[in-house]
Amino acid sequence: MCIRDSHHAAGGVGTAVAQICKAYGASTVIGTASTPKREFVESLGMHFVDSKSEDFVTVCKSMTGGKGVHHAIDPVGGNHLMRSYKALRRGCRLYCFGASAAVKGDRRSMVTALRMCASTPKFDPLKMMRSNKAVFGVHMGLLDDESVFKGHLEALSGMLLKGQVDPVIDSVWRFEQVAEAQRHMHDRKNRGKILLDFS
């Protein structure tokens, strides 16, 4: 049984993660989101966890007989990373790829960003060795090994051709509306990917 936990499950990455996990044979995918997105998250085959009222670590542990999940995907950052790490079972991985905890309200705040940075855990390599857990930072824009990138693209293309993944499109915005599209995503109104039309 391979169980994965994805935060912001209704967004562009979360919807893709759910489909990719299923394509790789995950028996259970756990996704956190707000209550209004519950039905949508469940329609993607994920076990829904309410991000406001439930503790995802407790849910992950309870669904796995106390063992934890195989993979945790964390776009939140800050002290949320340690909670995702605690949701892992021994020998498994946490993937960090965002820092949505750095943004609160309508505008960026240096104070909020500094608080997030200060609350980011310092993972102890010795403790990680004892628990056989791994933490990965992921930034596809900075991946410079073409062979790795090519392998990922080929795998995703194969899934698309087989119908195992079908990107969920929330909305398409004209390039002139980029600020509005960003606000739509920032306010967590999207369900799937937000696309920009450059034509």
Describe each model-derived feature in a short phrase.
Residues 144-199:
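C-terminal hydrophobic helical "lid"/dimerization subdomain
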Residues 45, 68-69, 165, 178:
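Local beta-strand N-terminus motif with an aromatic residue
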Residues 53-58, 66, 78-82, 175:
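Structural motif corresponding to alpha-helix initiation and N-cap regions
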Residues 4-54, 59:
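Mid-domain Rossmann-like dinucleotide-binding core that forms the NAD(H)/NADP(H) cofactor-binding site
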Residues 70-73, 95:
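N-terminal Rossmann-like NAD(P) cofactor-binding module of classical short-chain dehydrogenase/reductase
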Residues 63-71:
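A glycine-rich helix->loop->beta "capping" turn
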Residues 26, 79-164:
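Glycine-rich phosphate-binding loop and adjacent beta-alpha segment
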